[in-house]
């Protein structure tokens, strides 16, 4: 799976970078988590700082175009992102961490 960054837009007010990227894959469309891990490795970031919002694969193509938000640290991601996006990306919210520890 090869990831090419198409566009990066800085958003300093929300402490993040909006990234549009293209994934070329050999098999079926890769999972959101595998794309997140690969994108994080490409950008030299921690996987919890990357939130994949959209993956779009055209029928019959081996190319997926996606949109992600890359935060400066995981705390900003938890503060800004909606709960369902955190769940999709397997990022644990603050309240859930305390519940799991108990």
From Swiss-Prot:
A single GO molecular-function term is:
structural constituent of ribosome
Q: Name one GO biological process term.
A: translation
Record keywords: Transcription regulation included? no
> InterPro entries under this entry?
Nucleotide-bd_a/b_plait_sf, Ribosomal_eS24, Ribosomal_eS24_CS, Ribosomal_uL23/eL15/eS24_sf
* A cellular-component GO term for this protein: ribosome
The answer, when asked if Ribosomal protein is one of the entry's keywords, is yes
What are the entry keywords? Ribonucleoprotein, Ribosomal protein
What's a Pfam family in this record? Answer: Ribosomal_S24e
Record-stated family: Belongs to the eukaryotic ribosomal protein eS24 family.
Full protein name: Small ribosomal subunit protein eS24
Q: Which gene encodes it?
A: rps24e
């Amino acid at each position: 799976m090869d990831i090419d960054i198409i566009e990066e837009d800085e958003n300093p007010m929300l402490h993040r970078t909006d990234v549009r990227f293209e994934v070329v894959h050999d098999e079926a469309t890769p999972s959101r988590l595998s794309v997140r891990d690969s994108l994080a490795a490409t950008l030299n970031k921690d996987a919890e700082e990357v939130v994949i919002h959209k993956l779009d694969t055209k029928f019959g193509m081996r190319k997926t175009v996606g949109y992600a938000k890359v935060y400066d640290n995981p705390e900003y991601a938890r503060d800004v992102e909606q709960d369902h996006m955190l769940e999709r990306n397997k990022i644990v919210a603050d309240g859930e961490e305390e519940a799991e520890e108990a």
